[in-house]
Amino acid sequence: MESNSSQCEDETPSLLWGLDPVFLAFAKLYIRDILDLKESGQVQGVFFYNGHPIKQVDILGTVIGVREKDAFYSYGVDDSTGVINCICWKRLNNTKSSSATATPSARELSLTSQLKKLQETIAQRAKLEIGDIIRVRGHIRMFRGEREIHATTYYKVDDPVCNVQIARMLELPAIYRKVYDQPFHSPALKEDEALSNPGTLDLDSLTCLLSEKAKEFLVENRVQSFYQQELETVESLLSLANQPVIHSACSGQMGFKNDTTSRAIHSIFRNAVKLLQEEGLVFQKDGGFDNLFYVTREDKELHRKIHRIIQEECQKPNHVEKGCHFLHILACARLSLSPGLSEPVLQQVLQLLEDQSDIVSTTEKYYTAF
């Protein structure tokens, strides 16, 4: 019981799991790692990889074993890193129809034959043999002490020249490097840790946390514009920026902030505002004051001008059907509004306009206005 309670203390609280995108996705993991996942002590059926909560996975491999039961197939799947058992439920056969008194019409016969062909195709792709390539998406379960996958979706992959397998081999290392191998850090936990245990964050982490808190302050108070010096007078933000940080020799920040000098505080606020700029949440206008920042979501004039640009451009013959591409809107906005308008700021404005139903995304990166 003591080991179980200590394990729960090391885990991220279950209420915060939804903040990690990996929790809601089908994690593309190597089978070796699926077999080595640590099970949660809070919720059964949830596992952890490097702090990421995982409940469903996506695998691709070769069938090396087949067992058929009345209700399901049991496939042993090998992806060259390990072997795991996959329970793939059989699809119900609804082709049997009750005896009908009326003779079916030619159209009904045609639909019935097409449906039968479709069901035969599905059945062929659902029943696999040893040596076939299978893709499985499902939940991780324990059965008689062995870990297995209960499939929600599975199918045979036609891959005669190994294109799909090669693409998977190239995709997984990048996903691991960018997502799975990056520890999950909840902003809420970071804030609690920083406030309760001063000095537990490095400079970069403290800057990111300050940026998040500044964003919350701007949204809650509906701030339209601000100077950096004004943010530095907000007590909650200032107390956070005053936290001591862990020194990092490798990043060249040794001795940066042992004391809470005004210059150090000014620097961390400047970097936090820069992060907000990179996200497109705040921006500066050409020809304006150097230290004056505008909040993107509160600049209604900018929203109206971007909306008008999309309306006018969508009336032109080459944009009537499909709408305007994001880069075309950006070029027009830079030409007529501000040469320094950034892509993140425009993306924020387009998202706000779409949320208000002023514009619609017709296809990826294309927008039309009403």
UniProtKB/Swiss-Prot annotation:
In its UniProt entry, the species of origin is given as: Bos taurus (Bovine)
> Which UniProt keywords are listed?
Chromosome, DNA-binding, Nucleus, Telomere
**Family of the protein in this entry:** Belongs to the STN1 family.
Gene Ontology annotations of biological process type: telomere capping; telomere maintenance; telomere maintenance via telomere lengthening
Relate the protein's function as given in its record: Component of the CST complex proposed to act as a specialized replication factor promoting DNA replication under conditions of replication stress or natural replication barriers such as the telomere duplex. The CST complex binds single-stranded DNA with high affinity in a sequence-independent manner, while isolated subunits bind DNA with low affinity by themselves. Initially the CST complex has been proposed to protect telomeres from DNA degradation. However, the CST complex has been shown to be involved in several aspects of telomere replication.
Q: Which GO terms describe its molecular function?
A: single-stranded telomeric DNA binding; telomeric DNA binding
Can you say what this protein is called? Answer: CST complex subunit STN1
Instruction: Note the CDD domains from the entry.
Output: hOBFC1_like
Location of region: Interaction with CTC1 = 1-187
Q: What segment(s) does the record annotate as region Winged helix-turn-helix (wHTH) 2?
A: 298-370
The main location class comes to: nucleus
Q: Which residues bind DNA?
A: 57-157
**One of the record's GO cellular component terms:** chromosome, telomeric region
Q: Where does it reside? A: Nucleus; Chromosome, Telomere
What the entry lists under Gene3D superfamilies is as follows: CST, Suppressor of Cdc13 homolog, complex subunit STN1, N-terminal domain (1.10.10.980), Nucleic acid-binding proteins (2.40.50.140), Winged helix-like DNA-binding domain superfamily/Winged helix DNA-binding domain (1.10.10.10)
Subunit-level organization: Component of the CST complex, composed of TEN1/C17orf106, CTC1/C17orf68 and STN1; in the complex interacts directly with TEN1 and CTC1. Interacts with ACD/TPP1, POT1 and POLA1.
Note whether DNA-binding occurs among the keywords.
Answer: yes
Pfam families, alphabetically? Stn1, STN1_2
Write out the ranges of the annotated region (Winged helix-turn-helix (wHTH) 1): 193-297
Q: Which residues cross the membrane?
A: none
